[in-house]
């Protein structure tokens, strides 16, 4: 009861303007809006894209007004949670934006073979096909949201003075990833391998698809567009993966893996919290997530490795940007 009272206690000095992470979202919204207008004739779903931005504005304004009516910890939490919920709109929007650029999967698939001598996304799940292993790495992959949300909730409850900073770093990492995805259109193995044929991939042939994905009327539920999800089809976590995949997957956002980069950010924040139980509890899931990205064919292994690097950079740079 005492904690709930603390949540609803009116702040002594309410903020009048936007939170730092809301300013980041607004900057991304306005920058991509200019991009849409500049490429209007080349983008097939401009109405949908404008709708996404309208929804983001309305949600942000509504939660800001709610906070102004009752400025307290609870309404701060709702403002941050609102921005996290909007990620479900921003992610598929990157596919609509990067339609103006040619696909680059042939380059990344070639790099993958040069580095590893094979396509890890093709070989890994064939070699390690055991149901228990499939469920483990799939569990790691779908733990993505619980990891960064869990760290955010921990900061809100036990490190409130650092809550806004932690969520600023997490959410801004997403938006920086989205900028990369717009200008670096890589669909990933599940879409590229299906488009060019697994037999070509196995033979080391990586055709340049140019604007193939840009010209699609993509439907995530249509099996002609992607490989079937690998792994133990009757497993609980496989079904969870199917649900999340069908909810909004698009042929975009492969390099670098935002699953890995945001998880790296979350793990740094978990360590920074000085609660070692939090860090060690989440670490096995983070490791499994790394391997799960290319086990389920969402990414090339180089995407996951790049995610380690980008996540470390995001954490270091954004932590200092927030302090400034």
Map each language-model feature to its residues.
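Aromatic-anchored segments of alpha-helical transmembrane domains
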Residues: 29-37, 86-91, 174-182, 286-295
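Hydrophobic alpha-helical transmembrane segments
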Residues: 54-59, 140-151, 254-266
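N-terminal transmembrane-helix/juxtamembrane module of multi-pass inner/ER membrane proteins
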Residues: 2-55, 74-148, 186
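Membrane-interfacial catalytic/cofactor-binding modules of polytopic membrane enzymes
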Residues: 183-272
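Alpha-helical transmembrane segments and their membrane-interface exit regions
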Residues: 55-63, 84-88, 174, 288-289, ...
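Interfacial segments of alpha-helical transmembrane regions
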Residues: 77-81, 149-184, 190-207
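Structural signal for the C-terminal ends of transmembrane alpha-helices
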Residues: 62-72, 153-161, 270-274, 316-321
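Membrane-embedded catalytic cores of phosphoryl/pyrophosphoryl-handling enzymes
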Residues: 231-324
